[in-house]
Amino acid sequence: MKKFLILQMRPEDEAAKSEFEALMRVGGLERNEVHRIRLEKEPIPVIDIHEYSAIIAGGSPFDISIPEEKKSPVQKRIEDFFIELFDLIVPIDFPFFGACSGNGHLGKYCGTTISNTYAEPIGNVDVTISDAGKKDPLLKDLPQTFTAWVGHKEACDHTPPGAELLISSKPCPVQMFRIKKNIYATQFHPEADANEFILRINVYRHYGYFSPGEAGELIHAIKDSKAPVSKEILRRFVKRYRSKKF
């Protein structure tokens, strides 16, 4: 059986390790079912997508929307990598799931603007499945409105051209979209729980997501929060593409 390729973009080892474990745990993946690549590490290896059953891309502290001259060489290298990756997967509709930063890379590639217009503070938000989303295999029969974990400085301004909007929210209209039949992206974090976000609050307290002095208050506000429905989306993606051949 082919493995899932998990792409990560977090230079902070503690956050990267925790995210990787969360993706496996929520997705129901065993360690021998995945190939992990940390894209911020040099060099990025050559990837043959046909060696994998699907690709999952996680989050990142890098901001796609900042001016090019302010981007580090590492960030530029990652952005160039995703352009090359999408040049491969989009034409053949290869299974892909991008969460948060993965969402931004796919949205930009497909032609929408990424900006801070629909930034969301760290915490839970109510999201709503669209009429099109109700028919999607990853969302069918889920509650129409449910809670999801968010925390981002930028997002898609609009649904990318040619994409199907699957989930939206009042603070951020583009919470999940699909390209063709097998390429997905979410602005929210389906892998996350309160412990995961508490760790990220501590790791990223000086990264501009919130005032550093607010960390304790944020942790207190989210420590008992849960978002079980959003996890089902990642589980369904793994289940759907675990045995399919492309």
Language model segments and positions:
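Amide-donor transfer/coupling interface in amidating biosynthetic enzymes
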Residues: 6, 51, 91, 130-246
